[in-house]
Structures are given as structure tokens and as C-alpha cells.
């Protein structure tokens, strides 16, 4: 029989064990909550909560503060990576609930035309007022003249290199956004080596909103109109030659092909294939000719506009020319054959030339590109947005979708046709557009 004393000790011991268990459970829950609060997924939402706390600020337009600014370094690289970097700068400013001070872009790639590597104001390429009108309440741009006190600037250094991971970059931005002593400064100036080229914290839809607000200036739009008019005129001339043989009643359609077969691209894509252990990045001229020629629904004649590197325009031998080898009914033109290489493109820097070519390809009846090209991917993103506004969520079947796009480096329903291509708007990052993908499909999500 147990003594009363031993029963009492047992009860005390049981209570002690229960208390210890409760304490351990409490500690575990505390650390779990702490870890979750610092996870990458919640880091951005916490920063957005910080931004929302300032929504009632009297000095704001549609929730974006107009008396607090973010300044960023000159944006570099090619047109399309500059567009992405600019969008990231806008979204960073949005996360910190600040107005972005209008940044400078770069007139050319830094490894090409070194003598022309000079800053070019954003509003020399894209419409400033139109940007703010279209993006009202989402992101906002200001001119440096709007800053009251240029001496009140806080320099916020953004890291780079392999150790500066995506998670570390986001945590750094989040902590800076929550730091009230930093937020007191009228201007936060981000410094670092090309701080917006690499790290990505936002979904495709957020980037798409910014891109939609980036409307090129009238001068670039007019130059693109001239090129498109030349293409249409070439189509009409071909129709006149065919007379009764043509099956087209309306305007002769044109297909824009972003043809990446220049030497530096082929070297790059071969290395990329080796690194990624895939074989669907590079395409030979023959593969492009065959797959474009097998696109369903192309009428006779159809004009092809070949958006190619200038080095490919100088080929002397007919067999190696980008203009040779196309099937009957497809009439190829490039800048030189159209007569616009010097007359239009030659007047401008590399950046503006790219912007004109982008607009021309965007306006095509059909676009065909490479899914590992940023240029091609951004055009398909914008064409996807236009198609969705017309009610086309996919392009899996032939129909009334006037914004069809294809990836010639990927096989479609069979090896002989290119894959139908729409941007997946549900992706949580811009990875597939920034770095390319072989997982593209005919659905926008």
C-alpha cells in the first residue's frame, strides 16, 4: 500500500512534469512564430503591411507618398533587362511606400558602343506623364526638382555577389522599410553594383502592371509605324505580283521572327545548354525555317519581318543569308532589304533601335521568338496581356486570337511546328522571362 506521503510526492511530480511540458510547448510555438515571421514568403507581406500603415498620409497620391522618395543608380544592360530592372526599382519603391525619382537608362550595352555608353533620361524613351496616369495608385515617378531638400538623403547600400541571396536581399529591404529613423529621410538613395538586375521578389502580374504603364514616346512610336508601313507595302507589292493566285482578301499579314542565330548568341546558348543539361535553347537556321513554315493558318502571301542582329545583315553568301531558304508564299524582309536600316534605325543609339524593333514585333499579326530570349519573352508577355483583355486566356487552338505567339526553339504538337506560347500570369516570379524556360505553354494560367 502506498503511503500518503508518496502519493503527495507523485502528484507534485506529475504537476512538475506537466508544467515543464507546457513550458517546452510554449517555447516551441514562440520559435515557430519567430521563424515564420522571417520567412521569405512573409517578409514581403510584412513590408506591405508597413507600407499600408502610411496609406493615410496626407502627402500621398492614391496611397503612394509624394513627399518621400527613392533614388536608384543608372540602369544598365540591354533594353529589355533595363525594363525589368526599372520595374523592380518601381516595385521596391512601392514596397517602401515611396515615389521613385526618375532614373537614367543607358543608351547602349556596356560591352558594345562604349563611346555611346551615356545616361539617357527615362522620359526620352517612355512617356513620363502617361506612366503616372496609367500606374496611378500602384507606383509613381517624380522628377528630382520635386525634392525639397537634396541634403536630406540616406544612402542605403544593396549588396551583390553570390552571398547576397534573394532572401537576404528581401530581408534587407524589409528591415529598411520598417526602420523609422531611415524612413524620416526625404530621400533614400540605393547604392550598389546594378542593384536591380538580379534579385526578384514579385509575381509576374506586378511586373506586367508596370510594363503596361511604359508607353514609348511619340518619336519612337512614329518610327515603328514607318517600319510597319514599309512591311505592309512590301506585302501589297507581293500580292500584286500574284494577282489571282492570292487567297487573302484583307491586308497581307506579317509575321515577326526574332531570329537568334548570330555567333555570340550561339556561343552563349551552347554553354547554357551544357549548364542546364537541356537541348532546346539553340535553334539552327534550318530548324527556324522549317518550324515557322509549318505554322497553321498562314495565308499566301505572308510577309516575314526578321528581327536579327546587324552582323547577320552583312552575309555575302546567299546560302548563309537569313533571307534564303524560306518556303514558297513566305516573303522575308529585314531592316536592310526594307530600306530602313540607315534611314530609320541608323539615326539612333542601340537602346532606341531595340525599342523600335520591339514595337514592330509587338504589332505583328503573329510573333515567333526564342523562349530563352528576354526580348522575345517580354514581347510575348505584352501580347498575352492584350489577348487576355480580348477574352483569350489560351492559344491552344486556332481561332480569333489576333495576338498569337510561338517559340521556335520548342517543338509544338509535333516536331515540325513551333510551340504555341503565352506567358503564365500566375507565376510567383519573373524567372521564366528573365532567364528563359523550356516549360512554356499555350495557356496564360
UniProtKB/Swiss-Prot annotation:
Gene3D superfamilies: 3.40.50.11350
Pathway: Glycan metabolism
UniProt protein name: O-fucosyltransferase 23
Pfam families attached to this UniProt entry: O-FucT (PF10250)
Places the protein is found: Golgi apparatus membrane
Binding site for substrate: 258-260, 374-375
Predominant subcellular localization, coarse grouping: Golgi
Bilayer-crossing regions: 12-34
Function text: Probable protein O-fucosyltransferase required for correct pollen tube penetration through the stigma-style interface. May be involved in protein O-glycosylation events during pollen-pistil interactions.
GO terms for MF: glycosyltransferase activity
Glycosylation sites: 97, 179, 294, 424
Enzyme Commission code: 2.4.1.-
UniProt-listed GO biological process terms: fucose metabolic process; pollen-pistil interaction; pollination
Free-text tissue specificity from the UniProt record: Expressed in dry pollen grains and germinating pollen grains.
Listed GO CC annotations: Golgi membrane
Protein family: Belongs to the glycosyltransferase GT106 family.
Taxonomic path: Eukaryota, Viridiplantae, Streptophyta, Embryophyta, Tracheophyta
Membrane topology, as annotated: Single-pass type II membrane protein
Result of knocking out the encoding gene: Altered silique morphology and reduced seed set.
Keyword Nucleus: no
Amino acid at each position: 500500500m502506498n503511503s500518503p506521503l508518496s502519493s503527495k510526492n507523485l502528484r507534485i511530480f506529475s504537476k512538475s512534469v506537466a508544467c515543464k511540458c507546457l513550458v517546452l510547448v510554449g517555447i516551441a510555438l514562440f520559435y515557430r512564430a519567430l521563424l515564420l515571421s522571417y520567412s521569405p514568403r512573409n517578409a514581403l507581406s510584412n513590408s506591405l503591411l508597413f507600407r499600408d500603415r502610411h496609406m493615410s498620409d496626407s502627402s500621398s497620391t492614391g496611397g503612394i507618398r509624394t513627399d518621400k522618395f527613392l533614388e536608384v543608380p543608372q540602369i544598365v544592360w540591354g533594353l529589355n533587362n533595363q525594363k525589368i530592372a526599372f520595374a523592380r526599382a518601381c516595385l521596391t519603391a512601392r514596397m517602401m511606400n515611396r515615389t521613385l525619382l526618375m532614373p537614367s537608362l543607358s543608351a547602349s550595352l556596356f560591352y558594345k558602343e562604349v563611346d555611346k555608353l551615356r545616361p539617357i533620361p527615362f522620359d526620352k524613351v517612355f512617356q513620363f506623364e502617361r506612366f503616372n496616369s496609367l500606374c496611378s495608385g500602384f507606383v509613381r515617378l517624380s522628377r528630382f526638382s520635386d525634392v525639397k531638400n537634396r541634403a536630406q538623403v540616406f544612402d542605403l547600400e544593396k549588396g551583390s555577389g553570390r552571398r547576397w541571396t534573394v532572401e537576404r536581399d528581401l530581408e534587407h529591404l524589409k528591415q529598411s522599410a520598417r526602420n523609422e529613423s531611415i524612413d524620416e529621410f526625404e530621400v533614400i538613395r540605393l547604392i550598389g553594383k546594378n542593384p536591380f538586375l538580379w534579385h526578384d521578389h514579385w509575381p509576374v502580374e506586378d511586373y506586367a502592371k508596370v510594363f503596361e504603364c511604359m508607353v514609348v514616346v511619340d518619336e519612337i512610336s512614329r518610327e515603328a509605324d514607318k517600319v510597319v508601313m514599309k512591311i505592309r507595302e512590301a506585302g501589297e507589292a507581293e500580292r500584286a505580283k500574284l494577282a489571282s493566285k492570292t487567297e487573302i482578301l484583307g491586308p497581307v499579314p506579317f509575321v515577326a521572327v526574332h531570329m537568334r542565330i548570330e555567333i555570340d548568341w550561339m556561343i552563349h546558348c551552347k554553354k547554357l545548354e551544357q549548364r542546364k543539361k537541356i537541348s532546346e535553347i539553340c535553334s539552327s537556321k534550318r530548324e527556324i525555317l522549317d518550324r515557322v513554315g509549318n505554322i497553321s493558318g498562314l495565308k499566301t502571301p505572308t510577309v516575314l519581318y526578321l528581327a536579327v542582329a546587324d552582323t547577320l545583315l552583312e552575309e555575302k553568301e546567299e546560302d548563309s543569308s537569313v533571307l534564303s531558304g524560306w518556303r514558297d508564299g513566305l516573303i522575308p524582309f529585314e531592316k536592310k532589304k526594307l530600306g530602313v536600316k540607315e534611314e530609320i534605325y541608323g539615326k539612333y543609339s542601340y537602346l532606341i533601335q531595340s525599342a523600335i524593333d520591339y514595337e514592330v514585333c509587338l504589332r505583328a499579326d503573329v510573333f515567333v521568338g526564342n523562349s530563352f530570349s528576354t526580348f522575345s519573352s517580354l514581347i510575348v508577355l505584352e501580347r498575352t496581356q492584350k489577348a487576355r483583355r480580348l477574352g483569350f486566356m489560351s492559344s491552344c487552338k486556332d481561332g480569333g486570337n489576333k495576338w498569337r505567339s510561338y517559340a521556335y526553339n520548342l517543338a509544338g504538337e509535333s516536331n515540325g511546328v513551333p510551340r504555341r506560347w503565352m506567358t503564365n500570369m500566375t507565376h510567383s516570379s519573373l524567372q521564366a522571362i528573365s532567364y528563359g524556360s523550356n516549360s512554356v505553354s499555350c495557356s496564360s494560367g
